[in-house]
């Protein structure tokens, strides 16, 4: 294999690697957005659960009805 062929082969590999790196970066960016969205949803669910839990806590603290 001549030097020119080796250089062409390396340039070709480098071009494919650049494409692969860009594709991987695109996937990573998409996953990061999805992760951030899921974190926001999780925080909202935790807040809602805490609010619901505090509602149930108030029921337990109330005195029983007079017929008990």
UniProtKB/Swiss-Prot annotation:
Signal peptide: none annotated. It comes from the Bacteria. Pfam families: SlyX. Gene3D superfamilies: 1.20.5.300. Belongs to the SlyX family. NCBIfam families: PRK00295.1. This is Protein SlyX homolog. The gene is slyX.
């Amino acid at each position: 294999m001549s030097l020119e062929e080796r250089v062409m082969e390396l340039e070709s590999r480098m071009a494919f690697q650049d494409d692969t790196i860009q594709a991987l970066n695109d996937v990573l960016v998409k996953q990061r957005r999805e992760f951030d969205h899921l974190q926001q949803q999780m925080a909202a669910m935790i807040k809602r659960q805490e609010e619901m839990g505090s509602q149930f806590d108030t029921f337990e603290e109330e005195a029983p009805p007079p017929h008990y």
